[in-house]
Regions:
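Transmembrane and membrane-interface helices of multi-pass
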Residues: 2-232
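Short, motif-level signal for alpha-helix interfacial/capping segments enriched in acidic residues
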Residues: 43, 92, 265-269, 479, ...
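Conformational gate/switch positions in structured elements
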Residues: 66, 115, 142, 289, ...
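Soluble catalytic regions of membrane-associated enzymes that act on cell-envelope
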Residues: 204-560, 569-574, 579, 609, ...
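Membrane-interface soluble catalytic domains
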Residues: 529-653
Length: 653
């Protein structure tokens, strides 16, 4: 009797769960069919090289389909598992059926709409499209369905077929009866578990290293930027861009006047070092939190200050050093686009923004076109910070992370493999790359909680803040890296570029202001000793590395860049940073703050290095010329970003 009562209470619930799972499975099938149609219709643009590549993209697409399906089905899941006997009535079941069919039909319409729209944009639709076409006549969209009637009919047919199949799925036949406590308890457990799993699935994984899956993660599964749309689906693209800040379309001046003050098109080849290092390998070392403050050799004006980078101090004596180096951002996730592609964050990190699918001019891709092999090294768990996805978008062909290192005994317990161990791995692994090569390495040990291996805790200087010893550790790790690298046959034929991802406010008051917080070392080391010196006059930034490195190795083709080449003294030298909606422009001895509408501050960094005196209303300053240049810069940047024109030399405006 007890078993029968419990069964009569739980059997309808089991049928409801089975129906929910079958609906999820059907959704996966529908999304895959839409992806297949997308692929067939746009195969000429996708340029898929092999069946293996196609299979990988479809496999990767399931990850994004899962995220979209669980998010769009969250209401259905909740309503299906509510501990209510009324949820098994015929009327309630019809309501669930209607909800599921409406949501899935909308997904079909969105996905098939992008089958055609992709041919105009080469990316999935995001919420930016509603801003872009917000003022257009809505009947223009209806015309879209008429003009592409074949896809419209296909969509109608797919919706009808979907509804027929969904109608044949078995429904619960009865309401729960008997021991209702078992029904209520089991329903609550299933409801809570389903909501938790939905959040995890929508986020993209269980691990603490996993950030919410976003558009740029699709780059893991592709070979060409335009293929990303095949991996993604349109509901996911729309969901992931909800609430993402979009850039305003600045209209400070006619576009014809913009090049008078700033020209984003740059042609290398006119500096004394242009092409001097043609055919050289390039190793780019991105040092986590490598602030200028830590380097004694860059703070000789501070009496008695030694710093915490004795190796870097010695290396700078044999290098070319930009003493006025700046980061363009304050986060690691923003540094990668700036360093690799001269792309500043569009209010939010580029890789998390609605513009992350834009075409970019990237250093690895340009070098690849010149015959370079390309690799990226980062000792964190693969997928951390979305680096693997972005560097593939930037054209990197080989990725080496914690997975490839394959020795968890060297894991620091927080971020990844200790720098000392991983940099030795990098030095050895680089030798397997075909020359000429481009290899980038992103360190990680000088990061909170600023731990160092136990054997060095009593050896390395501790300084006054925990960060100091962590910096000293990475400096030591780099010394050992160069010792190993110097014994390799590729060493003398390599240019080494050392830059920070961002600065970190430390102990010195000189760096506790809006400009000091961005100051970083930028160092170019040539083992042959052909490039030695100090540039104490010109500004340099992360965004300058793209045009500068390409100029050094002999790429003389024009490019779009929002950085510059500090070796080129014919162009104005300035740096722009986005400080949470306030743009900071540093030019000469001045720092200008601008909120997009009005100037909020101007400081003379030479006479007022601590930025205590706002002189924006003082006459005789360079504010007018700086403001015109900044406005031209922002107007061109925002327009190119919004309309995916970051690679076009002469776009139609």
């Amino acid at each position: 009797m007890t078993s029968s009562s419990t069964s009569s209470a739980l059997t309808p619930l089991g049928a409801q769960v089975r129906l929910l799972l079958l609906r999820f499975l059907l959704s996966f099938v529908i999304y895959s069919i839409c992806r297949g149609i997308f692929c067939l219709y746009n195969q000429d643009l996708l340029e898929i090289g092999s069946a293996g590549q196609l299979a990988l993209m479809f496999w990767g697409g399931l990850r994004f389909d899962l995220s979209a399906i669980v998010y769009t089905s969250l209401l259905l899941t909740t309503l299906s598992l509510l501990p209510l006997p009324q949820a098994y009535s015929r009327g309630y079941q019809r309501m669930l059926t209607g909800l599921y069919r409406i949501v899935t039909s909308l997904a079909i319409i969105l996905n098939l709409g992008d089958v055609v729209y992709y041919r105009f944009t080469l990316k999935r639709t995001t919420l930016a499209v509603f801003e872009e076409f917000g003022d257009e006549n809505p009947f223009q969209f209806l015309r879209f369905f008429v003009d592409y009637w074949g896809i419209t009919l296909l969509g109608i047919g797919l919706i009808i077929l979907f509804c027929i199949i969904e109608g044949k799925l078995p429904r619960p036949k009865q309401r729960p009866t008997g021991r209702m406590w078992a029904f209520y308890l089991t329903s609550l457990i299933l409801l809570g578990g389903s909501i938790y799993l939905s959040i995890v699935a929508g986020r993209g994984g269980f691990t603490s290293e996993t950030r919410p899956i976003t558009l740029s993660n699709a780059n893991i599964y592709i070979r060409r930027p335009q293929q990303r749309a095949l991996v993604l689906n349109t509901p996911f693209s729309l969901i992931r861009t909800i609430g993402k800040s979009s850039l305003p379309e600045y209209q400070y001046m006619p576009f014809a006047e913009v090049p008078k003050y700033f020209n984003s098109v740059y042609t290398p080849g006119s500096t004394p070092v242009s092409g001097k290092y043609k055919g050289r390998n390039v190793v780019l070392i991105i040092w986590e939190s490598f602030a200028r403050e830590w380097v004694g050799g860059l703070n000789q004006d501070i009496p008695g200050y030694q710093g915490f980078t004795p190796f870097i101090d010695s290396l700078m004596q044999r290098s070319y050093v930009f003493t006025n180096g700046y980061s363009n951002s304050q986060k690691s996730i923003d540094a990668m686009p700036a360093i690799f592609a001269s792309v500043l964050k569009p209010h939010v990190p580029f890789v998390l923004s609605i513009y992350s699918g834009n075409n970019i001019t990237a250093l690895p891709a340009r070098l690849d076109s010149m015959g370079y092999s390309t690799a990226f090294f980062h000792g964190a768990p693969n997928g951390s910070m979305g680096f693997n996805a972005f560097v593939m978008q930037a054209g990197v062909k080989e990725y080496y992370g914690k997975t490839e290192y394959a020795n968890d005994a060297d894991y620091d317990g927080n971020w990844g493999i200790w720098d000392e161990k991983f940099l030795q791995y990098v030095a050895r692994q680089i030798g397997s790359l075909r020359q000429p090569f481009f290899a980038a390495e992103f360190t990680l040990s000088s990061h909170h909680p600023f731990r160092v291996p136990e054997e060095y805790q009593k050896v390395l200087p501790k300084g006054t803040i925990p960060m100091h010893q962590a910096v000293a550790y990475t400096d030591m790790a780099l010394r050992k890296f160069f010792e190993t690298a110097s014994k390799q046959p590729w060493y003398d034929n390599t240019l080494f570029v050392i830059v920070a991802d961002h600065a970190v406010p430390g102990a010195l008051p000189q760096y506790k202001n809006s400009t000091g917080a961005f100051r970083i070392p930028i160092i170019i080391f040539d083992p042959r000793g052909e490039l030695v010196g100090r540039d104490t006059e010109h500004l340099a930034s992360q965004a300058d590395l793209l045009p500068t490195i390409l100029d050094l190795v002999g790429d003389d083709k024009p490019m779009v860049t929002f950085g510059g080449n500090p070796f080129d003294t014919t162009r104005p030298r300035f740096v722009v940073q986005d400080m949470d909606g306030i743009y900071q422009m540093i030019e000469g001895d001045y720092a200008l703050h601008f909120d997009g509408q009005k100037v909020t501050a101007l400081y003379n960094l030479k006479t007022d290095p601590q930025q205590l005196h706002n002189i924006k209303d003082q006459p005789g300053t360079p504010l007018p010329s700086m403001l015109l240049r900044l406005k031209a810069y922002l107007q061109d940047y925002a327009w190119r970003m919004k309309y995916n024109k970051l690679t076009e030399l002469h776009p139609q405006r």
